[in-house]
């Protein structure tokens, strides 16, 4: 025993993990970095790649996280507090390293340790692959919420799917989006820890059969057609300058039996691994294309898989410290992030009734008290519905349970609204019109004690439109929780120059209490501060200009107005309205070469769903316009158009700080909230936008005079459509619009091919469901105001400062506090690191536990 290092002295009842794992000094960090490079990567510095060095640094930082993570877990086990479990199909986390350095407060010592080791921290941070676990705002919101939950010291577990290939990497070839496999895991993920000992089995397919149990009770048994194993992978999510590190648990699918030795022995080599291949497909990619029936089957199986794994995991955790599930809802508050996890309502009922033999009424009371449901969309196509044949084939027991839930629910409705058959049809979880289907948003609504929207307008529209009848039935269930974003990633990490400038004037308390930004307001009137502000902005714009040059070879003028629209490509987000304005500007300059226009750089980014042809055609149009404009010598620096491929969190961290103008131009009433609008405003961009989503609340906070408003309101949109909207009339009566559309149709941007953009133009001229033509002139006029305003740089800077100063409401910390108080009934639990680690540098572990 005397030859063992002190850390492994098993004669001591308390094992002291050596300081290199937890120490925070520069020398300790350098030593840990070298050790991890040698012992974990197996490399000498002379032969180590940059990725080896990144991995070694990541493991060094992860060691510091593990100390906090395990202390958090131990504290939660020892307290009787409720835990929020967040069910989300997406977590758009972004790279971990930089964020963890910010939250640990270790940026400076780590930077020094890395530089003294002959490396560059910026280069190592830039190497990290972005986790391919999300697509858009839904996943990024989940990531911001996880950050805020930990920062506010609220016990939480995030549950989701460990996608092997994420959504896709986007490349642009000949102007078209091309989807490339996102191999984000190919070089390893140092932040996760596999927990195969906590694997669970998930049933799919098969049939059900009734039976009578030993007590004479009627029961139903689900005989599965196949079994899939769920393997959890855990990632610590650390709060900002607290000791709380909550758990993100993501599930990977594997075959229950991955290799059939008998089939292999008789030469059936493919058959021997067939189960392995089909099972692992469940967690290969995010949102598989569901145009074909196989894609629909995979999506439903994927959603059910992660929900079942997560609920089984919660039950296992609960029963480890409780004799029954009677108080399950007192220990877990489960929040469903949109409709993807809504099958959880039926699954918890199945687990309670079939597996744990609860009577229906008691099981339902537990279920309803457990769940909350966040609605994120008003678009009918995004409100998931599954056809009964598909649903019944894949989840036969759940369909029976949903029928029972629906029957009991409609019985209640009949009692309150007798002789109202139309209302019953509108409220039924089963849609009887056309192909019969299960309405998942309705299942989530019926099975939850709380339903919320994500912006004031959105929540109101939820109550007035898609869930109107439910609101009339249960008004007390509905509330609004306006979204927010974390200032740690979107200001401190993304924009350190601006963050340091702000902190130099008002201190750094705003990082945890964003309302303190209000203290900036008086500085907007100080010429010296405005000068410092503009200096920071120009430096950040120069950074983005260099990045654009690296990616595209284009040289852009950092003194031009950076006009930015980066988000998922969708018709309702109206990237095509934006590019129509670009073409209008181009025509103005071509027709009047001496025109005094504010130089602009239009920057686009975003992905189109693989099966969404119109969105892909919009990307092609943007790139085709860019090709013409950027190569026209008569235009020069007055107009540049850039589409930067593969928009993700990393991309966002570059572009949000550099933007002058934030494009938030969705059709009023279509965007639930939006969070990009908040990130832009927090970084000093002014907004041009409609009265939609959180734009309304941003405008209320920053002041109407600091917001460029245009377009029809939601009631006006509804009225225009109801009166028989004729986009052709707008085209005929607006010379500017007609000139733009005619130029596109002439083949000017498509090498003479008049058919290329015809589907998009025909759609706008014929239907224009998102009122692009109706809002075109108002948008052009508002953009003219923007151009004039930008010429007065002093006043523009003042407006930008006030935008930032008034963004306190839009921290995700505020949002999470509201959820915790109004829906989850959860209080913070402070993690005292020194209780388990008296000197703050070690972790005490009992070998008997």
UniProtKB/Swiss-Prot annotation:
InterPro entries associated with the record: Glycg_phsphrylas (IPR011833), Glyco_trans_35 (IPR000811), Pyridoxal_P_attach_site (IPR035090)
Catalytic activity field: [(1->4)-alpha-D-glucosyl](n) + phosphate = [(1->4)-alpha-D-glucosyl](n-1) + alpha-D-glucose 1-phosphate
Any one Gene Ontology cellular component term annotated for this protein: cytoplasm
UniProt record similarity statement: Belongs to the glycogen phosphorylase family.
Protein name per Swiss-Prot or TrEMBL: Glycogen phosphorylase
GO molecular function: glycogen phosphorylase activity; pyridoxal phosphate binding
Keyword field: Allosteric enzyme, Carbohydrate metabolism, Glycogen metabolism, Glycosyltransferase, Pyridoxal phosphate, Transferase
Cofactor(s) essential for the protein: pyridoxal 5'-phosphate
One example of a Gene Ontology biological process annotation: glycogen catabolic process
NCBIfam families xrefs: P_ylase (TIGR02093)
EC number per UniProt: 2.4.1.1
Sites bearing N6-(pyridoxal phosphate)lysine, chain numbering: 679
Pfam families: Phosphorylase
Top-level class of the enzyme under EC nomenclature: transferase
Function: Phosphorylase is an important allosteric enzyme in carbohydrate metabolism. Enzymes from different sources differ in their regulatory mechanisms and in their natural substrates. However, all known phosphorylases share catalytic and structural properties.
Keyword hit for Ubl conjugation: no
ATP-binding in keyword set: no
